[in-house]
């Protein structure tokens, strides 16, 4: 366990106290069929107890179908069959009203190089007309860029290597009754594309259904805020996660804890509503768990709160509102 993790909410409130008690793996072969919706109607591929360490072989967002730079996404991809998800993982003892804690222990690229893919897709992206934001402009040309991704970095060009900063673009629990496309984010998690859902951090997800039914996939090697053209550096990975279960800690939005900050994630359209949802949840969190007066938290976040833009291209946009741990704790002493 990392030094900070032993002092995390996961370690303090989790059934397994943030400690590993078993090891499991989901390989591409054992996964078999990948999923394109998050719901409780698929047979769990794995059943574990809180404290389980799980190694997962994720696919890229295109399930490996874009193989070369001459490929045309419009001819190869079948929307909405994008964003393949591993899982579901059934967590023993998880009940509605609990919270699932997922510590992201490690992520590594896998497969034959070049494993990284980004592209321009017709009528998709933050600065183009889409089916939802219809324009008269002609679509941009379809362009595919394949890049080598290793632990040294993302080899963008001969002279430029971007840092390898992997994170899980899509992770979530099953909604209570719906089965929702893996392309959409919401209260259960989903396709948030928030870069802070990264190695070394914990994401907290609401349990809406017995067993939680955890899904994950769509791992990114690098991404700027907003995922502007709609496609980050998509790559297949071996991702190692550790799960724990927090009883009777009911949350309504995904939350992230790092060594330095606490974050609430809100999803919605327009973008300002996603920000409102994130900040409101953070204020309620500060009030309930740390004893802040609600209006004092509102005042404080006005001065020092930070906002992280996850994606601005999905059916709903995702925003993360955060406060530094040091600031939050010092504010309690006034």
What are these regions, as identified by a protein language model?
Residues 106-199:
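Intrinsically disordered, low-complexity linker/loop segments enriched in Gly/Pro
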Residues 48, 91-94, 197:
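Short, well-ordered loop/turn sites that connect or cap secondary structure elements
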